[in-house]
């Protein structure tokens, strides 16, 4: 797989993105099915056209015939969860989300960190985590988007994005920016000097007294 190739090339962290034209609707259905939230709660209100309620009813009329609803994901066995997610992706996931789901699973199997950003990449993360809950330890949100779908995904996963730039652009921009955060964090862990190594004088009195010893 492509994740295997990147791992063989020595990569430890990857950023994912999407370019699909229909992917937003796909991510809405995928997210609502996995988290259990109502379509009405994650549809965006618009000044013109059908109301949120009308749009939600239209989506229901199309999706419900495919029997993708799951009352309790936690009650399913591993194989049942996998089959249910595969059925969901086949019906409503779209190529972008289906491919990204497989890629995330492959990357996590190699203990590679995966940075995601918007509602579409978040839907793939939800699908991957539903198939294998341990994947959650390897996924990192990056930019905070105002999309209700994206907010619901982060709420369900229990994670918070760290970049707040009011981004409106997809195609992995937010994920790529998130790579810099991980890179900086690793430099701090591995390369940052201690006060002693940097020859910073220890406090002679006050709260910091006695916490370190300077070089003679």
What are these regions (language model features)?
Residues 1-216:
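N-terminal loops that bind phosphate or other acidic moieties
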């Amino acid at each position: 797989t492509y994740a295997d190739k990147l791992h063989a090339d020595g990569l430890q962290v990857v950023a994912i993105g999407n370019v699909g034209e229909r992917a937003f609707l796909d991510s809405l259905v995928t997210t609502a099915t996995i988290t259990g939230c109502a379509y009405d709660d994650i549809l965006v209100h618009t000044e013109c056209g059908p109301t949120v309620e009308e749009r939600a009813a239209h989506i229901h009329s199309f999706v419900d015939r495919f029997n993708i609803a799951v009352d309790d994901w936690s009650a399913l066995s591993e194989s049942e969860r996998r089959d249910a997610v595969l059925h969901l992706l086949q019906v409503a996931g779209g190529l972008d989300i289906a491919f990204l789901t497989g890629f995330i699973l492959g990357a996590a199997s190699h203990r590679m960190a995966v940075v995601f950003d918007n509602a579409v990449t978040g839907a793939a993360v939800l699908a991957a985590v539903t198939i294998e809950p341990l994947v959650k330890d390897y996924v990192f949100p990056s930019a905070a988007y105002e999309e209700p779908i994206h907010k619901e995904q982060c709420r369900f996963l229990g994670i918070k994005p760290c970049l707040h730039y009011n981004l409106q652009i997809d195609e992995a921009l937010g994920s790529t920016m998130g790579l810099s955060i991980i890179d900086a964090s690793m430099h701090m862990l591995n390369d940052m000097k201690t006060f002693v190594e940097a020859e910073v004088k220890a406090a002679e009195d006050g709260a910091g007294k006695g916490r370190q010893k300077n070089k003679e």
